[in-house]
Amino acid sequence: MYVSSHRLAAALTLTALLACNGDDAADPTATATDTDTDTSAGTSAASTTAASTTAGTTTASSESDATTDPTPGTTDPSTTTDSTTTDGTTTDGTTTDGVTTDGTDTDTDTDTGGAIDPFPVYVGEVGPIAEDNPRQFPFACRTADIGLGQPEIDNQDAEGLPILGDNDEVLGWSRDCGAKTRVDYFYKPIVPPEGGGLLPYDPLDPPDDVAMLELNGELRRYVVRYERGTINRFVYGIAVIAPEETDPAIPDLSAWNERLLFWFGGGVGIGYQQASGLAVNRLRTDTYKQPLRDGPLFEPFLEQGYAIAYSSGTVTDTTYNLELTGQTAVMVKKQFEAMYYPPKYTFGLGASGGAIQQLIYAQNHPELLDGLVPTHSYTDMITQTIRVGDCELLEHYFDVTDGANPTWHTWAKRAKIEGLNAIDGYQGSDWDFLQQGKPTGSSAGPGSSECIEGWRGLTPLAMNPLWVDANAASYKQILTHQPDVFADTPWTYWDDLVTIFGVDPKSNKGYARRTWDNVGVQYGLTALLSGQISKSEFIALNAKVGGFIAPDDMVQEGFPFGSQDPQDFDVWSARNGTASLGLPVAPRTEADLGAVQEAYYRGLVFLGDIDHPTITIMPYLEPQLDMHNAKQPFAIRERMLEAKGEADNHLIWAISSEGADFYPAVGLAFDTLAAWLDSKKKPVDALDRCYTAGLSLTAEGPDAWSGALTSQPDDDGPCAALYPVYSDSRMVAGEDISGDIFKCATKPLTTALADGTYGALTWSPDEIAALEQIFGETGVCDYSKPDLGRPEDL
């Protein structure tokens, strides 16, 4: 092999893989958005033309006169690559009548939402858009930043990005951001460039210093084919080693191992863009200079013979509309199958939001993937919003509302309420603006919590329709070219998915219905029962923690999000919480049950009913207070157990936080998946495991994680003892680890006082009166009952 195991071990750090704060973001105010190191789209024609030809040999204008019978690994090249396509699509990506230029009828039903099957998309053609794609508007185009040039003109109605001529005159506008497909070639020279990477390659004038790569026992020329274009409005990329390719219409698959790796990206995005900064920086032409950049040009996996597929529309930093992104993933795979060849196996890989996508797509599109390797996992996005909302409500209570109470001055005590990890003495908080050894604004001593280090910034991003990072290139583009549209756009997770959740009939501004709810939640219940907090502290917490005001009433964020004035300090988004109303009992927030039902019906909730071999890789990041906590793989397993009664297809492999351990673990997972699928049964060595630094196996077996899913004392298996699993705020309130209750069923407070909910505690008449003020009308959560929003016919 050209690449050795020690080189694979030296792959990118976890930070580069995750990029949940964009591309190596350092600014804490950019949490969960994207940090664009590329230029803003919408530049002059001269600059975008240059951007599209700076690297590789573009074949966008190449034509093939050859006519051959399609064979495995090739496609029918009998087409020219001008703006008239042969698949019944126009250059703006819209579907036509399904009749090709040679008269062949291509009308077929597909599950991509289109009326025709428009694949393959050849060089010079623009990929299709599914008929039921909601075509969100505004929609920032990023093709120029990625290296595909200005997008195609698709309207003269001044909608979208203005497309400029040679003298910067406006020729038209692009709303759908289509770009013609192109293929670039790169190669590894015998003497690699300083810093590694590849060099541009011209297949019609090949250099004489191409390195050789051993694949399948044969030496192959190290030449990479890199195809990019737009499908379903998003930019896709497909790369594979193609040693002898000379015609982009006929992919050379002689070095392919017959496996497709679909790499899914993470991050938290709220839509209205073709690609976030994270996605741009994985698809740009110049990524050939970065040999270990996760994405389509990741050399270690190419060197093993994998073809790699990627799309800006399967990066959750772009959008969390998993209905749309799943549709896009299916279409990208169709392009691969039509242009290249149906793979023997398709493996999923991705961290964070990339892990979520694998689970959701295995559920909603079971034919897309054969094996899953989710890392830094969550069950889904929508049930994570529940915990995200709790974090700032609780931190504001600890810091401000009850900030004088010494109970909350230790981080360990806060953890008893939040459930997530917190560390007294933790150093290096991203939110320590004043260098005090703790997050600025905190009433506690030195230290921090996962609520802050992992989740701070997600509340304004996901919940406030008025706030968006206008410095991110996508949103700066919209603000520059369509300021009125920008001002009228609601920037929230739910509004990005308004076609799923529907418009809230109570909103005068047309905002989407929401799924967030904390009615009846008894924050800190477990801490109360274990004696960690007093009855008076429990009562005060639940009276004052509150919820969120209606989106119609929300105001712009303070410093450091919306306002740049430190005197307007509000890291908790407290101005948009009901605690700010100053009432004796701060009102809770109630979900729209119709929105919750749509979340289930439309496949946004991971239900656990999948049978794909799944190996969850969990870097143990609790000491870093990272948002990717150790509870999540076990929430996945619990949902599988609840759905199927077993989870034999699911493995949990924990590794250290050392970045060098990550990709070797992924390689082992791929080998295990291949053996599993080849034999059509689970290998005997496919077991739960945990490793320490250097990928040193510590323990494996069915009891390795004993205790992680139980509450029995002294029941921890060796892996659970090595890597402790924490909980979250709703588990502290009585929910189980599956974390899938949007709106709890409630029982009357009088019932709770009598049925043992409070253990052996006794309450005075004044204390009962105080509890009645909080929970008398709503009751308290009864987590023995299912989610009120879960449809009975699901």
Q: What are the residue ranges of the model-derived segments?
A:
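Sec-dependent bacterial lipoprotein signal peptides
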Residues: 1-18
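Ser/Thr-rich, Pro/Gly/Ala-heavy low-complexity intrinsically disordered linkers and tails
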Residues: 18-113
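C-terminal His-loop and adjacent cap/lid subdomain of alpha/beta-hydrolase
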Residues: 111-794
